[in-house]
From Swiss-Prot:
Its main location: virion. One of its GO terms (cellular component) is virion component. It comes from Human cytomegalovirus (strain AD169). This is Glycoprotein UL22A. Changing E33K: In strain: Isolate clinical 5A, Isolate clinical 44A and Isolate clinical 49A. The gene is UL22A. Glycans are attached at N49. Residues 29-59 have a biased composition (Polar residues). Residues 21-103 are annotated as: Disordered. Keywords: Glycoprotein, Signal, Virion. Belongs to the HHV-5 UL22A protein family. Changing E92G: In strain: Isolate clinical 17A, Isolate clinical 21A and Isolate clinical 22A, Isolate clinical 30A, Isolate clinical 33B, Isolate clinical 47A, Isolate clinical 48A and Isolate clinical 79A. InterPro entries: Cytomegalo_UL22A. Residues 86-103 have a biased composition (Basic and acidic residues).
């Protein structure tokens, strides 16, 4: 009887831990707020909020980062502009083009 009770309690703990685990993939996000600037021609830019988000890690702790970022720029007027993703392949192609220009 004690053995069955021990097995049932172990099963209950296992289910509780499994249900409390975070989702399989989480995301990291960083928001950078630039200070407000004047528009008097003093070489300043309008205030923009920039958010970078990147894929997270799986529940087993293995990181799943491929170097891709979603960049969302929010202008001071509340409009948003989605920037294209720069992948590792795109960066490599750009580096090759730059090397050709130098030579």
């Amino acid at each position: 009887m004690a053995r069955r009770l021990w097995i049932l309690s172990l099963l209950a703990v296992t289910l509780t831990v499994a249900l409390a685990a975070p989702s399989q993939k989480s995301k990291r996000s960083v928001t950078v707020e630039q200070p407000s600037t004047s528009a008097d021609g003093s070489n300043t830019t309008p205030s923009k909020n920039v958010t970078l988000s990147q894929g997270g890690s799986t529940t087993d702790g293995d990181e799943d980062y491929s170097g891709e970022y979603d960049v969302l720029i929010t202008d001071g007027d509340g409009s948003e502009h989605q920037q294209p993703q720069k992948t590792d392949e795109h960066k490599e192609n750009q580096a090759k083009e730059n090397e050709k220009k130098i030579q």
